[in-house]
Swiss-Prot record:
Species in which this protein is naturally found: Prochlorococcus marinus (strain MIT 9313)
Sorted UniProt keywords: 2Fe-2S, Amino-acid biosynthesis, Branched-chain amino acid biosynthesis, Iron, Iron-sulfur, Lyase, Magnesium, Metal-binding
Positions annotated to bind Mg(2+): D79, D121, K122, E444
PANTHER family: DIHYDROXY-ACID DEHYDRATASE DAD, DIHYDROXY-ACID DEHYDRATASE, MITOCHONDRIAL
Pathway it works in: Amino-acid biosynthesis; L-isoleucine biosynthesis; L-isoleucine from 2-oxobutanoate: step 3/4; Amino-acid biosynthesis; L-valine biosynthesis; L-valine from pyruvate: step 3/4
Residues modified as N6-carboxylysine: K122
Cofactor mode of binding and number, as noted: Binds 1 [2Fe-2S] cluster per subunit. This cluster acts as a Lewis acid cofactor.
Protein name per UniProt: Dihydroxy-acid dehydratase
EC number annotated for this UniProt entry: 4.2.1.9
Length: 556
């Protein structure tokens, strides 16, 4: 029996049916599955501006497949627009709001399945958390990647504009050049074009089996994206008939596959946070140490921005995520028996994919000639992060640095210092009180890291924070430091000039201060009043867990 029978069957449900008749149901429709279409459409960001078209295609395909689609909206926050402002504190919060809204709408109306459509960074994990919680048949449709901007012969992304700010501040480019980059960086609809957070999470979801093969790298404005959205609705109707539910697919092995693909494509640090949160909602025992274990055996084989040369449409043209997965599967680095929402195993899905990438491209490297021999997202531990932290070590020349701490209590203070040439080669920049509780909201530090790169300090300065990093960040950056400063973590005890060692080879992050002195500082530490005590941010700060657990708000 369909779950929606709770609102469509029996004489007692006559009032319920009366309401449904008002929105277009006829007598025969009460026997059809009701599908929710969670539409993240918004004109605030290019990531989501094209979602209405995909929603309409999905809606029509669902009707043709014998279902009754019911569309409802969910929110988005544009990370690129809110970046570097107080508004960025709402970004990670929006992941929880999206998850809660989808769960609420679907369960309140007893929907039989849900097709979630999203574009910007938090849309993907928010939808996946909801699907995992509800465990009703579901499919995710990614809005698609933006195509690269062009300036002369150079491919641009929005990160090019962030880096140009640092280049302008250091005198490397003039205002006219800065404006030219600004005007050409984002040419149309779609999510930020490199292997940044949105494209990383779409790749992870395709690997997990809750979106269709090849769909995670399609360009937003191409017809194949709209066709894929329509096909996704058909697949969802079949999944309802076959009772294929998210938790059937979201196994520990599936998460290990997703982590392997994130490493192989050189994905965002945010994947650690989001996959931990999705796994928790699915009841899967995934921990931060699993990422390090997998990193040690999976190389980076895609040469993608931010640290590489190419963008996601180039990856799609080179064979997409299936081509990446086929190499990993053949090498024994993936679990081939994991299934997708179509009910097919990974091994079945990849049987016709070439074992080696085409020699006519160099976006996807063969395993024998990787971009990096090991994964790029290292989990460091030490007295500065006893619960762990995430270091992105791709594109850096020196994975070991010991230097003096430059301590900042906010992103804004740090950015001002960088742009005023007060951060020098060899410094270890510490931005604290930006964690899940302390921020609150764990802002991304793209503006400071881009300014560092723009001033040609990317391989000479390290940055440590209890906040996050954008998927567009590269260099020696260490985020998600836990415990965070606001709850008494060691990062809150660092003083200006203290010696800090980051050693990616030894997986170590250490504050080089005598134990007695650290104990003295700890005893003198006092918890500060929350920056927000009411509203969404106040509520979030009271509820959110540590970054090492995914920064979730529904912990038991």
């Amino acid at each position: 029996m369909l779950r929606s029978a709770a609102i469509t069957k029996g004489t007692q449900r006559s009032p319920n049916r009366a309401m449904l008749r008002a929105v277009g149901f006829g007598d025969e429709d009460f026997n059809k599955p009701i599908i929710g279409i969670a539409n993240g459409y918004s004109t605030i960001t290019p990531c989501n501006i094209g979602l209405n078209d995909l929603a309409r295609r999905s809606e029509e395909a669902a009707r043709q497949a014998g279902a009754m689609p019911q569309m409802f909206g969910t929110i988005t926050v544009s990370d690129g627009i809110s970046m570097g402002t107080e508004g960025m504190k709402y970004s990670l919060v929006s992941r929880e709001v999206i998850a809660d809204s989808i769960e609420t709408a679907c369960n309140a109306q007893s929907m039989d399945g849900v097709l979630a459509i999203g574009g910007c960074d938090k849309n993907m994990p928010g939808a996946m958390i909801a699907l995992a919680r509800m465990n009703i048949p579901g499919v995710f449709v990614y809005g698609g990647t933006i195509k690269p901007g062009k300036l002369a012969d150079r491919d641009l992304t929005v990160v090019s504009a962030f880096e140009a700010v640092g280049q302008h501040a250091s005198g490397k480019i003039n205002e006219e050049q800065l404006t030219a980059i600004e005007k050409n960086a984002c040419p149309g609809a779609g999510s930020c074009g490199g292997m940044f957070t949105a494209n990383t999470m779409s790749a992870a979801i395709e690997t997990l089996g809750l979106s269709l093969p090849y769909s995670s790298t399609m360009a937003a404005e191409d017809e194949e994206k709209a066709n894929s959205a329509a096909r996704s609705a058909e697949v969802l109707v079949d999944a309802i008939k076959a009772n294929i539910c998210p938790r059937d697919l979201l196994t520990k092995n599936a998460f290990e596959n997703a982590i392997s693909v994130v490493m192989a494509v050189g994905g965002s640090t945010n994947a650690v946070l989001h996959l931990l949160a999705i796994a928790r909602s699915a009841g899967v025992d995934l921990c931060i140490d699993d990422f390090e274990r997998i990193r040690q055996r999976v190389p980076v084989i895609c040469d993608l921005k931010p640290s590489g040369r190419y963008v996601t449409v180039d990856l799609h043209n080179a064979g997409g995520i299936p081509q990446v997965m086929k190499q990993l599967l053949d090498a024994g680095l993936l679990h081939g028996d994991c299934r997708n929402v179509e009910g097919k195993t990974l091994r079945e899905l990849l049987k016709d994919v070439p074992s080696e990438p085409s020699a006519e491209q160099d976006v996807i490297h063969p395993l024998s000639k990787p971009v990096y021999a090991k994964g790029h997202l290292a989990i460091l531990k030490g007295n500065l992060a006893s619960e762990g932290c995430v270091a992105k070590i791709s594109g850096i020349k020196t994975p070991v640095l010991t230097g003096p701490a430059r301590v900042f209590e906010s992103e804004e203070a740090c950015l001002a210092a960088i742009l005023n040439n007060k951060v020098k080669a060899g410094d270890v920049v510490v931005i604290r009180n930006e964690g899940p509780v302390g921020g609150p909201g764990m802002r991304e530090m793209l503006a400071p890291t881009s300014a560092i790169v723009g001033e040609d300090l990317g391989d000479k300065v390290a940055l440590i924070t209890d906040g996050r990093f954008s998927g567009g960040t590269y260099g020696l950056v260490v985020g998600h430091v836990a415990p965070e400063a606001a709850v008494g973590g060691m990062i809150g005890l660092v003083q200006e000039g203290d010696s800090i060692t980051i050693d990616a080879n030894q997986l170590l992050i250490q504050l080089n201060v005598e134990k007695d002195e650290l104990e003295r500082r700890s005893s003198a530490w006092e918890k500060t009043q929350p920056r927000y005590q009411t509203g969404v941010l106040g509520k979030y700060a009271r509820m959110v867990s540590s970054a090492s657990n995914g920064a979730v708000t529904d912990q038991p």
